[in-house]
Amino acid sequence: MAARDGDGWIQCRCGSKHWGKFGAAGILIFRENAEGGREIFLQHRAPWVHNGDTWGIPGGARDSHESVIDGAIREAVEETGIDPQELLIRTSSTDNHGNWSYDTVIAEATQELVAHELNDESHEVRWVLFDDVTRL
């Protein structure tokens, strides 16, 4: 396994401080549930992490040797224990700040995808109907 060299803060040209010396990546996972509704997989972040006590997608700092997809999947596996074989990568989107970027990988999951809070970075993980996301 290659060294983890991406953890750390960077002062961004936008004036903000961001986590991830080589940028960061997250994965937005969606699926159609058994009733035909669209769901998104969300993580309730622990209070001590960057942007803590908020709901969002699993993700974090990318290491220097990682592709966007590899970094996003690694973070999701570390935080939620998902099986990457249960994902179909659809696309990705980049929020580029010049000297730092955040990449969102968008993936479709099978109904069998199982996840749980795997480390102390999460209070909770769960599937949420698209229409219910703003209520969290």
Q: Where on the chain are the PLM-derived regions?
A:
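A residue-level structural signature of the nucleotidyltransferase/glycosyltransferase Rossmann-like core
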Residues: W19-G20, T54, V125
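Conserved Nudix-box catalytic region and its N-terminal flanking loop in Nudix hydrolases
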Residues: E35-E79
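A generic fold-level signal
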Residues: W19-F22, E35, H50, H97-W100, ...
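Conserved hydrophobic "DFG−1" position in protein kinase catalytic cores
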Residues: I29-R31, L42, A107, W127
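Short, flexible active-site-adjacent loop segments at beta-strand->alpha-helix junctions, enriched
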Residues: A24, N33, A46-P47, A61, ...
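Unchanged
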Residues: G60-L136
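Acidic, metal-coordinating catalytic segment for phosphate/diphosphate chemistry
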Residues: M1-A34
